[in-house]
Amino acid sequence: MTYDNIVTGTFLKRPNRFIAYVEVKGDVKTCHVKNTGRCQELLVPGCTVVLEFHPKAKEMKRKTEYDLIAVYKGNLLINMDSQAPNQAALEWIREKEAKGLSLENVGIPTNIRREVTHGESRFDLAFELKDEVTGKTVPAFMEVKGVTLEKEGNVFFPDAPTIRGVKHLNGL
C-alpha cells in the first residue's frame, strides 16, 4: 500500500470528526481526517501531521485537497487512515506466502473475501485454509484493528469504549 503526494503540516484544530485545519507551507488548509475516532491525545495543536495531497481534488469532486493520514507523537509516526490496516492486511494475506499466518499443516489462504457476515457480525476478511494432511478446508475470519492510542511506547485498541469491539470478539 502506498500514498502519493505526501506533505507534512502543522495541526491547528479539529472542529468535527471529519475535518481538520492544518498549516501547510504557511497556508491553512482544510483536510479530510481519515479516522473518525476521538484521537484527542494525538491531534494536539502544534503537532506534525502527514497529509496526502490530491492535485485533482476538484475534478474528483472532493471537498478537500488533503487527507490527514498520520500524526507524529514525539518520534513515533502513528497511522490515522482507518482504511490502511485493512488494505495492508488484505495485501499481506494475498501474498503467496502469508508469513506469520501459516500454522502447522495449514496451506495458503484461498477464497479471500472482504466484509463478510458471519453470525451477527461482519468481519473485515474471510478466507479458507486447507489442512495439508487431511485435505479438509476450514473457514477463517480476520478482524483488523488499527491503533491510535499510545502510552509510554505501547499502543492500545480501542481509544474509547466500544460495544462493537466486544461484539467482534464474541463473534470470533
Regions found by a protein language model. Give the residues of each.
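Short aromatic-glycine-enriched beta-strand elements
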Residues: N16-Y21
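OB-fold (S1/OB) nucleic-acid-binding surfaces
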Residues: V22-V28
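Basic, amphipathic alpha-helical patches used to engage nucleic acids or provide basic targeting signals
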Residues: G153-G171
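Active-site metal-binding core of divalent-cation-utilizing nuclease and nuclease-like domains
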Residues: L76-Q83, S102-K145, R164-K167
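Short nucleic-acid-contacting surface segments enriched for D/E, G, S/T with interspersed K/R
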Residues: G37-V50
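Structural detector for short beta-strands of small beta-barrel domains
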Residues: Y3-K13
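Terminal, basic amphipathic appendages of nucleotide-handling enzymes
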Residues: E52-E97
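Short alpha-helix capping/helix-loop boundary micro-motifs
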Residues: K29-C39
